[in-house]
């Protein structure tokens, strides 16, 4: 009897424990379902939002890829520790200029507060200026005093200093003094050249001139030598002089040889040319033509160049010859 009772009790306990376990399992499943049901919309929403943001980023990336990007070079800035300290001090100084959060009380005078702020800001500014310009011996207060003095007492335009300045500005620049061979010996190269050409007479300085624009123009093709500006006019023989006076053709004249500083010989013609003016009066001139353009080009002659013409005779027949002489270098003048 007792054995049957014990077996029945054990079976009952087993059924109770198995039913309790099933109930616990069912309760845990129901709790999990409820929690999962609450979290599912949140996960879905978060996934949708993440997907939307990803699509927006990809869209922006595709949009900016349409434009070329500018390459930027890497710049390495080496900062000076002293400069950093000055910057920090400048920041602290500028921050002390005006504190907007400081509101004066009802008992304080706004004008006194404003005056204090202005005085502190001006002193800070002057301190910064003095620190930035340590090499300047004058202080900022001296500069302000000088500025106020200049504004109060402007310079007098009629003072002696101002008049001297105006006079110096209005004075024309001195013209270049042309080089002259007067009273000087003939250049050495010309003397040697006469020796090789069997010179029999000369050399003689007959003319000096600062070249004009017409003297170097290819259209004119002549060197004009006014008769009244000749240094000497006895370089022609009576026969040559009569030929020049009798000839009326512009292309005829007395044949001669011209030697340049490079010791190159050129065939030229000396011609008489009468220049008539609007007043009716005329002037007599000698002109070296027929080959003058080649001489200008070979010797690179330009307007305002100083030249001199020398005459000499060569050979047994005393053929008329000229020499083109330029000023010597400055160190030999």
Curated annotation (Swiss-Prot):
- The reply to whether Transcription figures as a keyword in the UniProt entry is yes
Does the UniProt entry include the keyword Repeat?
Answer: no
Q: Name one GO cellular component term.
A: nucleus
- Enumerate the subcellular locations listed in this protein's record, separating them with semicolons: Nucleus
Q: Which Gene3D superfamilies match?
A: DNA-binding pseudobarrel domain
The residue ranges marked as DNA-binding region are 220-328
| Composition skew (Polar residues), residue ranges | 76-99, 134-143
- UniProt xrefs under Pfam families: At2g31720-like
Identify the domain of life. Answer: Eukaryota
Chain intervals for the UniProt region annotation (Disordered): 76-179
InterPro entries according to UniProt: At2g31720-like, B3_DNA-bd, DNA-bd_pseudobarrel_sf
Q: Which UniProt keywords apply?
A: DNA-binding, Nucleus, Transcription, Transcription regulation
Q: Which GO terms describe its molecular function?
A: DNA binding
For this entry, the protein name equals B3 domain-containing protein At1g32030
Species the sequence originates in: Arabidopsis thaliana (Mouse-ear cress)
Taxonomic lineage of the native organism: Eukaryota, Viridiplantae, Streptophyta, Embryophyta, Tracheophyta
């Amino acid at each position: 009897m007792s054995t049957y009772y014990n077996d029945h009790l054990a079976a009952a306990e087993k059924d109770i424990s198995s039913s309790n376990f099933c109930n616990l399992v069912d309760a845990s499943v129901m709790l999990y379902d409820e929690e999962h049901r609450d979290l599912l919309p949140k996960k879905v929403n978060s996934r949708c939002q993440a997907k939307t943001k990803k699509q927006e980023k990809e869209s922006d990336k595709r949009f900016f890829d349409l434009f070329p990007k500018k390459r930027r070079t890497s710049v390495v800035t080496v900062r000076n520790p002293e400069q950093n300290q000055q910057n920090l001090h400048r920041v602290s100084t500028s921050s002390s200029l005006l504190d907007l959060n400081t509101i004066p009380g009802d008992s304080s005078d706004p004008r006194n507060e404003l005056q204090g702020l202005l005085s502190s800001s001006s002193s800070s500014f002057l301190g910064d200026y003095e620190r930035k310009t340590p090499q300047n011996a004058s202080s900022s207060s001296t500069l302000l005093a000088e500025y106020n003095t200049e504004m109060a007492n402007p310079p007098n335009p009629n003072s002696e200093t101002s008049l001297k300045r105006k006079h110096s500005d209005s004075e024309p620049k001195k013209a270049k003094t042309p080089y002259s061979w007067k009273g000087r010996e003939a250049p050495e190269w010309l003397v040697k050249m006469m020796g090789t050409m069997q010179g029999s007479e000369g050399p003689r300085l007959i003319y000096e001139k600062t070249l004009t624009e017409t003297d170097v123009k290819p259209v004119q093709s002549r060197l004009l030598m006014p008769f009244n500006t000749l240094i000497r006019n006895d370089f022609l023989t009576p026969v040559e002089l009569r030929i020049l006076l009798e000839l009326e053709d512009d292309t005829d004249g007395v044949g001669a040889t011209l030697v340049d500083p490079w010791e190159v010989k050129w065939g030229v013609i000396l011609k008489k040319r009468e220049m008539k003016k609007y007043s009716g009066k005329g002037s007599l001139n000698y002109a070296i033509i027929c080959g003058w353009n080649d001489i200008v080009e070979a010797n690179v002659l330009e307007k305002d160049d100083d030249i001199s013409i020398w005459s000499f005779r060569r050979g047994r027949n005393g053929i008329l010859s000229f020499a083109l002489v330029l000023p010597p270098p400055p160190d030999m003048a």
